[in-house]
């Protein structure tokens, strides 16, 4: 049986049930193809990721991810990425965790990246300075050396995005696409932040432990 660990990266600003379901659905699918998932890792980005005023400090975000995963027996929060002083490329985060996972579980354990379809759609995004948000060679390595699992998201079309990229389109068949048939959700961190600012309830869209942390620290009151 093949063994892998799953990595989810992102702002987690705040973490939602959709983030947790993404990992759960990925694991459930892998189990049907004779693959054991030994661990799930949620890695928030560092504060240097961007200068958006909505991105709260990483010390708050990592604590929320810890709260969100507290009851899980296989998903954990990791602060390596978010405590670095500079932004870290996803490929380097994967390499870091693969090394640690193999030390912990054995050299045969692989590492796979789990993302939403909206992240794949960002593969072709051009930044204001004209540079690419994603490096094509990084994407190629993620797909061929690690493994990419994509959860379908509302309004995203990851397959079309991949097919539009000459450097990686030939690897479409290596990407695992999954869909949450049990609990499809349009919940997002953006919607939660807006709801909090507008004094609306976010109960059941994120674990109660996260809600309590947000309330205790007076987070997202202004956007």
From Swiss-Prot:
Named in its record, the pathway it takes part in is:
Cofactor biosynthesis; NAD(+) biosynthesis; deamido-NAD(+) from nicotinate D-ribonucleotide: step 1/1; Cofactor biosynthesis; NAD(+) biosynthesis; NAD(+) from nicotinamide D-ribonucleotide: step 1/1
**Catalytic reaction equation(s):** beta-nicotinamide D-ribonucleotide + ATP + H(+) = diphosphate + NAD(+); nicotinate beta-D-ribonucleotide + ATP + H(+) = deamido-NAD(+) + diphosphate
Keyword Iron-sulfur assigned: no
The record lists ATP as bound by 19, 190-191
Entry cofactors: a divalent metal cation
Q: What is its EC number?
A: 2.7.7.1, 2.7.7.18
Which molecular function GO terms apply here? ATP binding; nicotinamide-nucleotide adenylyltransferase activity; nicotinate-nucleotide adenylyltransferase activity
The residues listed in the UniProt record as binding NAD(+), with positions renumbered to this chain, are: 11-12, 87, 90, 116, 118, 133-134, 153
Keyword annotations for this protein? ATP-binding, NAD, Nucleotide-binding, Nucleotidyltransferase, Pyridine nucleotide biosynthesis, Transferase
Cited InterPro entries: Cyt_trans-like (IPR004821), Euk_NMN_adenylyltrnsfrase (IPR051182), NadD/NMNAT (IPR005248), NMNAT_euk (IPR045094), Rossmann-like_a/b/a_fold (IPR014729)
From the UniProt annotation, give the residues forming the signal peptide: none
BP-aspect Gene Ontology terms: NAD biosynthetic process
Question: CDD domains in the record, alphabetically?
Answer: NMNAT_Eukarya
Q: Which domain of life is it from?
A: Eukaryota
Q: Which family does it belong to?
A: Belongs to the eukaryotic NMN adenylyltransferase family.
Purpose: Catalyzes the formation of NAD(+) from nicotinamide mononucleotide (NMN) and ATP. Can also use the deamidated form; nicotinic acid mononucleotide (NaMN) as substrate.
What name has this protein been given in UniProt?
Nicotinamide/nicotinic acid mononucleotide adenylyltransferase 2
Q: Which gene encodes it?
A: nmat-2
């Amino acid at each position: 049986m093949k063994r892998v660990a799953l990595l989810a990266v992102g702002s987690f600003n705040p973490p939602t049930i959709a983030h947790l379901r993404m990992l759960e659905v990925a694991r459930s699918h892998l189990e049907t193809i004779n693959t054991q998932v030994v661990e799930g890792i949620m890695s928030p980005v560092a504060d240097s990721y961007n200068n958006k005023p909505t991105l709260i400090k990483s010390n708050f975000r990592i604590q929320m991810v810890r709260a969100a995963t507290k009851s899980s027996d296989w998903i954990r929060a990791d602060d390596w990425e978010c405590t670095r002083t500079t932004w870290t490329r996803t490929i380097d985060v994967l390499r870091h965790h693969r090394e640690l996972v193999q030390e912990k579980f054995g050299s045969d354990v692989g590492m796979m990246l789990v993302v939403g379809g909206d992240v794949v759609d960002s593969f072709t995004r051009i930044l204001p300075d004209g540079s690419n948000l994603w490096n094509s060679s990084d994407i190629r390595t993620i797909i061929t050396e690690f493994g990419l699992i994509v959860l379908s998201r509302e309004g995203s079309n990851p397959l079309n995005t991949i097919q539009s990229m000459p450097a990686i389109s030939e690897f479409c068949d290596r990407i695992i696409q999954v869909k949450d048939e049990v609990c499809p959700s349009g919940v997002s961190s953006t919607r939660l932040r807006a709801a909090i600012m507008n004094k609306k309830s976010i109960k059941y869209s994120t674990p109660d432990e996260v809600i309590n942390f947000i309330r205790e620290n007076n987070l997202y009151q202004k956007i």
